[in-house]
Amino acid sequence: MDAFYASVEARDDPALRGKPLIIGALPHERGVVATCNYEARKYGVHSAMNIREAFRLCPTGVYMHPNFDKYRAVSRRLREIWSDYASALETVALDEAYLDVTQKALSWENACAFAREIKRRTLEELRLTCSVGVAYSKTAAKTASEEKKPDGYFEIRTPRDFVSLIEDRDAGVLYTVGEKTREKLKRAGILTVRDIRDRPEEVVRLLGRQGEWITRVAFGEDDRAVTPYRPEDAKSVSRELTFQKDVEDRGFLKDVLLLLSLSVERRAARYGLYGEGVTLKVTWGDMKSLTRSGTVPSTRSAAVIWQETGRLLDTLPSRPVRLIGAGLHYLGGENGRQVSFDDILPENAYLRDRAVQEGLDRMQARYGLDFKANLDRIFHGETLYKTVEYMRKHR
């Protein structure tokens, strides 16, 4: 989709059309740009940019918080349209997916007709534009979809066509080459895709297995199948929050970790996942980040996540914190899960759950909020962020 969040907002509010629109944090808040429309990009604003830098570049822009409930609803309709044409659908984001239309289209011409039909239906049914790439591989299709944005359509039929299109472009045009990898290549004098093709052994020596893949892509090779996302294949489940002002209060940070742990528990339970590792993420006030991990018996218990992240936090120096996060990793489903002490001794789980309930009671007394009665609402949309900001101001 083209500037998805911003396009949805402009569709629903005609007054926003033609104006630079930045979705993310507000200018006086901490945060980044989630997305922006093409009018804002003319000022140099882009996704992931610090919001204050965006405001410096585009002070006349319209700044809005994202409305994820609205975007998810549109995303569901998009998937319904896509599913009419694809035998396999691999969702990359709310607004982006790979579609394997081979079995339904049966010919290149029909595949191209499907692409145009998807564009037509997206415009007529959702009043949104999209850019579609038709190609022989996932990498080529992604490249094609970016070629004529916005409202674009482009075809790359063969590896030779792909190479001819990109070989004189910056190496960063390859979607497997991030900024750090690009800098490594640049220091070695490898600037373009053609350079990668001319010096494949050097790229492999420099980057190892990643270099092998990048070299293959530079030659137009990509045999990856379109694979529908399966939650059980996820490597981690996590939740994090950025504070509007740095926080050093350990009691408050542990209260936030309890809410984050409950959120992680809910996400893991939704997909039937358990984890054997807990991760704490912290970003200090100077923007330096670190993660700490601990091993736990197979669990998705908020109590276990809370206890372990609290323990990990206690190992860190007391410094102003800008962001804090909790996560569960080494994931697996019920079938591969080993029996834990909670299965053998249910009273252990009960005692830990009681610790969570007592923690919520203490938080109610401290902040004046009924957390137990409002957990469903707290974890909905942006409410968790707003709740934590209220807690920070009223502690």
Where are these regions (language model features)?
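Short, hydrophobic beta-strand segments
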Residues: 97-103, 289-294, 339-345
